[in-house]
């Protein structure tokens, strides 16, 4: 599947918020002027229409999770079929992607790095190698780093970075064993308050 390979901070500046596309070793605002649009001079951002606000929110979430437009729309359709709040269902589906869970557990410093680990067959689910980043993780699944991959410096570095940030309550990780359990589906209160998923629902409902 195609992926955006351009400058990560350009996307961050376009959305005006930290998309967690970089490792988090340094504060994002020390590297990137979030209030300025991309470009050498960072032209002042125009006031957005209602549609523009909805579109920006969708782009922000889509880019945060590293999902392309067609796949993101499919996630929305799946979320709409489920019982409950469509917006919250959408976030839950995105959170159950294997690449995201690998990132949440700290095996990858970014979701892009976690996706690469999965694609390169460095990750196991319940003892079996899975190389599909979009693989849906279920409650109580055990995620581990393949033994032959455990010496990778980037995984050790990622775990060190993860130890410095707040740990998600819905995963349990044994950093020494490079193994973790996806204990439960995250609740809306567990996730970023900076996301307004209702704007995405309104966008796709038109």
From Swiss-Prot:
One Gene Ontology term, aspect cellular component: small ribosomal subunit
Q: Name one GO molecular function term.
A: rRNA binding
Q: Which keywords does this Swiss-Prot/TrEMBL entry list?
A: Ribonucleoprotein, Ribosomal protein, RNA-binding, rRNA-binding
Q: Which InterPro entries match?
A: Ribosomal_uS4, Ribosomal_uS4_bac-type, Ribosomal_uS4_CS, Ribosomal_uS4_N, S4_RNA-bd, S4_RNA-bd_sf
Q: S4 RNA-binding domain: which residues? A: 96-156
| Pfam families for this protein | Ribosomal_S4 (PF00163), S4 (PF01479)
Please verify whether the record's keywords include NAD: no
Q: Name one GO biological process term.
A: translation
- Spell out the subunit comment: Part of the 30S ribosomal subunit. Contacts protein S5. The interaction surface between S4 and S5 is involved in control of translational fidelity.
> HAMAP family of this UniProt entry?
Ribosomal_uS4_B
Q: Which family does it belong to?
A: Belongs to the universal ribosomal protein uS4 family.
Role this protein plays: One of the primary rRNA binding proteins, it binds directly to 16S rRNA where it nucleates assembly of the body of the 30S subunit.
This chain belongs to the protein called Small ribosomal subunit protein uS4
Provenance organism: Shewanella loihica (strain ATCC BAA-1088 / PV-4)
């Amino acid at each position: 599947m195609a992926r955006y390979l351009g400058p990560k901070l350009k996307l961050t500046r376009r959305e005006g918020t930290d998309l967690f596309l970089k490792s988090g070793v340094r504060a994002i605002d020390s590297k990137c002027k979030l209030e300025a649009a991309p470009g050498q001079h960072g032209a002042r951002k125009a006031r957005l229409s209602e549609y523009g606000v909805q579109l920006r929110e969708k782009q922000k979430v889509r880019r945060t999770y590293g999902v392309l437009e067609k796949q993101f729309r499919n996630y929305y359709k799946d979320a709409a079929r489920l019982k409950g709040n469509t917006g919250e269902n959408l976030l839950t589906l995105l959170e159950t992607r294997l690449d995201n869970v690998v990132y949440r557990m700290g095996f990858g410093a970014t979701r892009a790095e976690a996706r690469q680990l999965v694609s390169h067959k460095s990750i196991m689910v319940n003892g079996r190698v899975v190389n599909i980043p979009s693989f849906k993780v279920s409650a109580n699944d055990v995620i581990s780093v393949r033994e032959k991959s455990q010496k990778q410096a980037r995984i050790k570095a990622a775990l060190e970075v993860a130890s410095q940030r707040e740990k998600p309550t819905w995963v349990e990780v044994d950093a020494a064993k490079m193994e973790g359990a996806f204990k439960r589906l995250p609740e809306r209160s567990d996730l970023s308050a900076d996301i307004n998923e209702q704007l995405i629902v309104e966008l796709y409902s038109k």
